[in-house]
Swiss-Prot record:
GO terms for cellular component: extracellular region. It comes from Phyllomedusa trinitatis (Trinidad leaf frog). InterPro entries: Dermaseptin_dom. The modification Valine amide is found at residue 29. This is Dermaseptin-1.2TR. Keywords: Amidation, Amphibian defense peptide, Antimicrobial, Secreted. Has antimicrobial activity.
Length: 29
């Protein structure tokens, strides 16, 4: 349904945001 689609999108977005944060941290080190 629509709700599970929203949850999936949120999970993907969170994953992408987490990866971006890790990349930033790696650059700072």
């Amino acid at each position: 349904g629509l709700w599970s689609k929203i949850k999936e999108t949120g999970k993907e977005a969170a994953k992408a945001a987490g990866k971006a944060a890790l990349d930033k941290i790696a650059e700072a080190v």
